[in-house]
Design a protein with these regions (language model features):
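Extracellular/periplasmic, surface-exposed regions of secreted and cell-surface proteins
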Residues: 1-217
């Protein structure tokens, strides 16, 4: 939870009062007093299973679920599995006789992860704030307006990564060599794109747009 409150004033004639008596100021301009409240929530569950066969073959499977109040109601939960496999070839009989090789392992894995960067606590909701003061029937009245363009369909940005690699150790692991290739793809990327005003109140709208891939050694 994040809360805040701040006032400002102008025209305090006595410096001895400082901020201890803001009421002594000659004026308190509009916009000089404000407050905020944010209460985003995140719930997570996770499970993991590891299995090793003959001290040679290893399997690890995990699943994570994250639920956030910052995305749309239809996309609250994101589920992110991962799996990895490895083969310790040094445990094979046909390789044990090679004394110079102390380690030789092949491994591969796949996993998904989620990201909410760029989404504030209430981006999916239609929220308002004070805009100014106008006179209504000779009385000052505060007007209200939208804080930002809301998007109730926001969802998790997701990255999927696959990798395959090998580890080689020589001469009692005095020399260790590692080679790895990876490929990752990000989908439903969060991006603030240009929109017309009107019908929108502002010229930017945050949405899940596009994808991006990376690969390398």
């Amino acid at each position: 939870i994040q809360t805040g409150f701040w006032p400002s004033a102008q025209g305090i004639t006595n410096n001895d009062m400082y901020y201890h008596n803001i009421g002594a100021a000659a004026s308190r301009p509009f916009g000089g007093t404000d407050s905020n409240y944010e209460d985003p929530t995140l719930a997570s569950v996770m499970g993991n299973v590891d299995y090793t066969l003959y001290n040679k073959y290893s399997l690890s499977v995990s699943m994570r679920g994250d639920g956030s109040s910052m995305v749309g109601n239809d996309h609250t939960w994101g589920f992110f599995p991962s799996v990895s496999l490895s083969w310790d070839m040094k445990q094979e009989k046909w390789l044990r006789s090679l004394q110079k090789i102390t380690m030789l392992k092949l491994r591969t894995g796949y996993g998904r992860s989620g990201n909410l960067g760029g989404i504030s606590s209430y981006t999916t909701l239609n929220t308002v704030r004070q805009n100014g003061i106008v006179s209504v029937n000779s009385s000052p009245t505060v007007t209200m307006g939208m804080i930002s363009n809301n998007n109730p369909d926001l969802k998790w940005e997701t990255r999927a990564t696959w990798n395959i690699g090998a580890d080689l150790g020589l001469w009692n692991n005095r020399l260790v060599l590692t080679a790895e290739y990876y490929y990752s793809k990000t989908t439903d990327m969060l991006y603030a794109y240009d929109v017309p005003v009107p019908p929108f109140a502002y010229d930017k709208l945050l949405a899940n747009l596009g994808s991006m891939s990376n690969q390398g050694l």
